[in-house]
């Protein structure tokens, strides 16, 4: 069993659920404390039951010393994998740098995707001293997957889809779960270089992830 989760320092639901009636402040201390408490509880529960985890660090969590310290400690003590997620982009640092509130990696231009990937992977390396062997997002299109494998060949696997993010993800209005079967395969697969959701038919189509 592999438990995969992430320290989501700026949960996407936060401003809708816990921030109602308040001025937007994605950096407020209460939000960060709540997010870290959730992460700690998940880690504690897994380890108490003898399970290892894959900690998918988000861009936002890479700026949080406590989240980074916990990941390092649990990597050494329990053998947890430290991975990298392309979720968790909408933090203050990201908004200031890219001048946008958008956070869906698949909706950016290819040039912006490359810049964001290099930024996130570079920040990860700065904090941990190595590059991750796995990554992920709600949806990773073929161009993005191909670029990551070419630029960061140590990446072996990716959570490249979410059960509700499929072809309709590009509408960016998938706010209900009626698209239950719109996502990618529900089991491991080798994605095609042409289409992430299409399994590679042969070695030539193999994306390498």
Predicted regions, residues:
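Short catalytic/ligand-binding loop motif for oxyanion handling, primarily in non-cytosolic enzymes
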Residues: 10-12, 62-66, 90-94, 141-146, ...
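Glycine-rich loops and low-complexity Gly/Arg-rich segments
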Residues: 27, 78-83, 108, 159-163, ...
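Extracellular structured ligand-interaction cores
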Residues: 2, 52, 79-81, 132, ...
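Active-site-adjacent pocket scaffolds in enzyme catalytic domains
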Residues: 133-209
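Metal-dependent polysaccharide deacetylase catalytic core of the NodB/CE4 family, i.e.
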Residues: 57-139, 196-209
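Short glycine/serine/threonine/alanine-rich loop segments
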Residues: 51, 130, 154
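Amphipathic alpha-helical segments that form well-ordered structural scaffolds
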Residues: 38-45, 116-123, 127, 147, ...
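Active-site beta->alpha N-cap acidic-glycine motif
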Residues: 1-78
